[in-house]
């Protein structure tokens, strides 16, 4: 079992980054991650505006898988996700789906007995998922806050323990990074956050040689998802419609 700590993190996925860990195909890796605010918000007096964009969405990595080549696919099995003792949620009037209708605030959400204690009256069963996970793109540096065909900030709530993600390999070694774990998240981020939390993620990585994919695929056990990220909705629809 290999491990990589959260101090080995990046804010972009890039073909030019040096790997922080080398593993073999079939190896298991324990990946420790910061929350999406780089663990800088610890109480409700600290607001998102004090964090700075240079600390948002850190991903631990890159992890190079020896033998992975462009045109291969990287199979990433999510074996387990263990989260910290408290999650952080923030709102800001300039961000999200409700601009101008919310104030800038922070909510610290304790995690107790497998539930997120949002308030005295509201508890939500946790379902930890990985928000940012991807390989290095072939020719450009892409911020970890953006999703593309290599993965990235897909914020797909089905990327949970027990699921398997298939990612395109575009550089030698694949250079996998992951982070932005949520204790729980809905179908999207209305306020540009879920229950953001530090975590320890265990994965198994396997190279599927000569089996290219045009975009990420996820096998949840119950369904298979093609994940497309485009600026325009219809472009995303076309991308997943022509993957055969």
Give the ranges of each region predicted by the language model.
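Short, Lys/Arg- and Gly-enriched loop/turn segments at beta-strand edges
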Residues: 36-46, 81-90, 173-183
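Conserved mixed alpha/beta catalytic, RNA-binding, or beta-rich assembly cores of soluble enzyme
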Residues: 130, 143-148, 157, 163-235
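N-terminal, Lys/Arg-enriched amphipathic/low-complexity engagement segments
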Residues: 2-46, 51
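Conserved small/polar residues in nucleotide/adenosyl-binding loops
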Residues: 243-244
């Amino acid at each position: 079992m290999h491990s990589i700590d959260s101090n080995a993190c990046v804010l972009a996925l890039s073909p030019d980054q040096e790997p922080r860990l080398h593993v073999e195909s079939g190896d298991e890796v324990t990946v420790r991650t910061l929350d999406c605010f780089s663990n800088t918000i610890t109480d409700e007096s600290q607001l998102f505006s004090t964090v700075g964009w240079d600390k948002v969405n850190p991903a631990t990595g890159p992890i190079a898988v020896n033998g992975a080549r462009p045109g291969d696919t990287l199979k990433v099995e999510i074996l387990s996700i263990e989260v910290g003792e408290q999650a952080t949620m923030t709102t800001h009037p300039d961000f999200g789906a409700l601009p101008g209708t919310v104030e800038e605030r922070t909510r610290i959400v304790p995690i107790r007995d497998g539930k997120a204690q949002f308030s005295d009256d509201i508890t939500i069963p946790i379902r930890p998922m990985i928000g940012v996970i991807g390989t290095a793109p072939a020719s450009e540096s892409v911020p970890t806050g953006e999703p593309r065909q290599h993965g990235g900030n897909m914020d797909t709530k089905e990327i949970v323990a027990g699921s398997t993600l298939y990612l395109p390999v575009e550089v030698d070694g694949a250079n996998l990074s992951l982070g932005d774990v949520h204790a729980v998240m809905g179908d999207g981020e209305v306020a540009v956050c879920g229950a953001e939390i530090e975590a320890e993620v265990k994965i198994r990585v396997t190279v599927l040689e000569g089996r290219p994919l045009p975009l990420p695929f996820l096998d949840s056990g119950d369904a298979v998802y093609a994940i497309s990220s485009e600026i325009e909705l219809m472009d995303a629809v076309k991308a997943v419609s022509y993957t055969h």
